[in-house]
Amino acid sequence: LIANSDQVLVNFTGQNIVNEELILDKKITVLTISDHPLLPSGVGTQTKYVIEALLRSGKFNVISLGGAVKHQDYTPQKIDGYPGFWEIFPVDGYGNAQLVNAFINDRKPDILYFMTDPRFYEWLWSIDDTIRKNIPMVYYHVWDNYPYPKFNKRYYESNDVIASISKVTSDIVRTVAPQVEEHYVPHAVDSNIFNEKTPEQIKKVLSSNKPFQDRFVFFWNNRNARRKQTGSLIHWYKDFLELEGVDRDKVCLFMHTDPNDPHGQPVQYLLDHLGFKEGEVVLSTSKLPADQMSMLYNIADCTINISDAEGFGLATLESLSCGTPIIVNMTGGLQEQVTDGEQWFGIGIQPASKAIIGSQQVPYIYEDRISREDFLNALLEMYQMDPDKRIELGKLGQKHVQENYSFENFGKQWVDLMSSVYENYGSYETRKNYKNIKVEEL
């Protein structure tokens, strides 16, 4: 079954989605909805990590509806190599009501897990009564900023359990919908991949990449989108090169992004317009596997994220895991990465302005902007910092990630959480702790 571009339910080559293997299996079956879990997006990657942890526990099977992109091939994929059963069904968008109900009726999953921005799931929450009468709904959620989004209250209350990605999100959910079970489950990085490389490995890479040789490298790994502040980054970096004490022949801004993203600015035009010299800015435009991304963090001296809104920010967490310090805007989930409240693992820049913006779906939310002056000061401080101190910042950040965002703890949290959801809420004949009516005093 797939949902085509017109969101019409279609039989895929006459295939019956009922799977006898799952019916006979006594494992807990989870239906997931998210970005395709084999895509390199943040949502896709984290969902893959969740799924892998569940499967490796030996207690779960997983059926995934993989969306977010226009697929060239809608053939279901059975993923081998795990103790449990895992099958992925490509869908347009994130599916639709008819599709989800069909999977629930035919595959009989015990839990529905879903993840991404809430604006993509209004259709799902509109049918929560038909879903939750049979199985619990678990939402993996992040919200960028305050004020408390009271307009999300009805969505939060349409879930049995919410897992919050950041401390900001955890506080928001507990305040807006205190009766909903909530757990703080932050993102994680795989330290087997994102780790500190040896000097020999780094030297080998640098020897074949001339632009980075004998230069201080600022790394920016972000989507080229408005909230990421691409234009401000480039213009202000140009100003940084002209500061007294900066040797522009010994500094490089390394940008891993799509310079032609329709949601962003024309990066190459900006670079040409501002007259950057060769080697001052280097672009990396190809999608790279995780092990190669890990090496990029290692050849960098510092990683930057100055987004005006950032629910979490995986790139800076990956950077810290590799031992590379960060410069970030003190907003959203970036705040808990750069400091634990006592020690710092880079430089945090306090927003200079907090505008309340919004849209028809999101009536209000803070947009945190840093100032040019504060950004230049942060770049200069990192650039002029004693190398041993900068290395120590990175090592402290690495320890921070290992203690608070470890891959092992992330997996255990999800196995324990989904096991407790199954025990406490049940499914079908054992469904409990759910009422589809609410009585309020007028």
Question: What are the functions of these language-model segments?
Answer:
Residues P325-V328, V338-T339, F345-G348:
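Short hydrophobic beta-strand element within catalytic cores of glycosyltransferases
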